[in-house]
């Protein structure tokens, strides 16, 4: 909702684009993809006054049409499969900590009833801070690493300094 976006933005979060309806965009036409992305970017801009700079493809499903149409770098991240309720708190913690790396993007979900991720974060955040990691926005990460926010990169970034499509 617009209120949640404003609240997160005012707390210092980036508000990026993940689509309006979470479709498999590889099965959509260029026009359908553009409409999906523009709708969401327009809503974000209405809510917080800035357009998204990054796009996270639903299901991490991509094709060349998406790269051609979507004028933003694609991001993914390392996660804990926390969309799966069968994955418990400790396993979520272990997965995230095992994949942590300098410049890495952590992907976790805020979904209905997903209290296990909230509980896991209570352990993940202090553990990563103890290891010297800092938590920054995607935009701050790219700037800190000197990585251009290039909409034509055709990379799905899981870490900032990535140079191949998948990292």
Report residues per predicted region.
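Short, basic/aromatic-enriched C-terminal tail that caps enzymatic domains
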Residues: 146-167
């Amino acid at each position: 909702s617009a209120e949640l976006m404003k609240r997160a933005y005012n707390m210092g979060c980036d508000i990026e684009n993940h689509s309006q309806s979470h479709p498999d965009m590889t099965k959509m036409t260029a026009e359908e993809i553009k409409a999906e992305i523009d709708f969401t970017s327009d809503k974000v801009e209405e809510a917080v006054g800035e357009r998204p700079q990054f796009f996270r493809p639903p299901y991490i499903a991509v094709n060349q049409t998406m790269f051609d149409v979507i004028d933003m770098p694609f991001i993914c991240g390392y996660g804990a499969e926390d969309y799966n309720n069968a994955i418990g708190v400790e396993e979520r913690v272990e997965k995230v900590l095992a994949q942590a790396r300098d410049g890495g993007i952590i992907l976790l979900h805020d979904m209905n009833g997903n209290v296990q991720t909230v509980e896991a974060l209570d352990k993940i955040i202090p553990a990563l801070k103890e290891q010297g990691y800092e938590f920054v926005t995607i935009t701050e990460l790219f700037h800190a690493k000197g990585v251009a926010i290039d909409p034509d990169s055709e990379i799905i970034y899981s870490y900032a300094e990535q140079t191949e499509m998948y990292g």
